[in-house]
Amino acid sequence: MAKKALVEKAARKPKYAVRGYTRCQRCGRPRSVYRVFGLCRVCLRQMAHRGELPGVTKSSW
């Protein structure tokens, strides 16, 4: 789980636009966040396996 202070800090609008970064909406993880879903790779995988993301399927080739 992310530190609450860092989650609050990321929610504020930065002074310069390039300093802004995405965080997972579910757990607050700052790295490897898919912008389309707003989730990190860990949460995306968990929710996809449970079927909570409509239209997302496990690929196989």
Swiss-Prot record:
Free-text comment on the cofactor: Binds 1 zinc ion per subunit.
One GO biological process term: translation
Any single GO CC term annotated in Swiss-Prot or TrEMBL for this entry: small ribosomal subunit
Highest taxon in the source lineage: Bacteria
Binding-site list for Zn(2+): 24, 27, 40, 43
Annotated keywords: Metal-binding, Ribonucleoprotein, Ribosomal protein, RNA-binding, rRNA-binding, Zinc
Pfam families (UniProt xref): Ribosomal_S14
Cofactors (names): Zn(2+)
PROSITE patterns reported for this sequence: RIBOSOMAL_S14
InterPro entries to which the protein is assigned, alphabetical: Ribosomal_uS14, Ribosomal_uS14_bact, Ribosomal_uS14_CS, Ribosomal_uS14_sf
MF (Gene Ontology): rRNA binding; structural constituent of ribosome; zinc ion binding
Described function: Binds 16S rRNA, required for the assembly of 30S particles and may also be responsible for determining the conformation of the 16S rRNA at the A site.
Assigned protein family: Belongs to the universal ribosomal protein uS14 family. Zinc-binding uS14 subfamily.
Quaternary context: Part of the 30S ribosomal subunit. Contacts proteins S3 and S10.
PANTHER family: 30S RIBOSOMAL PROTEIN S14, SMALL RIBOSOMAL SUBUNIT PROTEIN US14M
Protein name as annotated: Small ribosomal subunit protein uS14
